[in-house]
């Protein structure tokens, strides 16, 4: 079982509903459409994640939180959709959401259909 987050460049949506609509459009465009190299901001964000947590493909001790790798392969243009192991999702998703905000990016949780980080994170 995995837990997913989507992160993208753009204006912060007004609410969770607007974020869900933006997510649906961006996912269809960038994950189901033609694959593009990640933009510089998305690339910097993914590299920051990999500075914090080991890449799944380099994980010899089962400590990587990622469910797929290489993580950079999950990015396309101004959008990245990544999965993490459910057993590590609480800590990792909260920190990944904070890191996205620090990079000026939008973070959306498609399971709970809400923007992240939340006010209690």
Where are the predicted features?
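Acidic (Asp/Glu-rich) sequence patches and key acidic residues
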Residues: 1-121
């Amino acid at each position: 079982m995995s837990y997913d987050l989507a992160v993208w460049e753009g204006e912060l949506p007004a609410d969770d509903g607007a974020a869900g609509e933006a997510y649906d459009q961006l996912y269809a465009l960038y994950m189901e459409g033609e694959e593009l190299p990640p933009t510089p901001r998305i690339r910097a964000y993914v590299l920051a994640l990999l500075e914090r947590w080991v890449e799944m493909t380099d994980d010899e001790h089962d400590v990587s939180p990622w469910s797929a790798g290489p993580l950079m392969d999950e990015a396309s243009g101004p959008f990245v959709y990544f999965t993490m192991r459910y057993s590590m999702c609480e800590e990792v998703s909260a920190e990944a959401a904070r890191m996205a905000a620090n990079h000026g990016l939008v973070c959306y949780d498609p399971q709970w259909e809400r923007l992240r980080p939340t006010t209690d994170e």
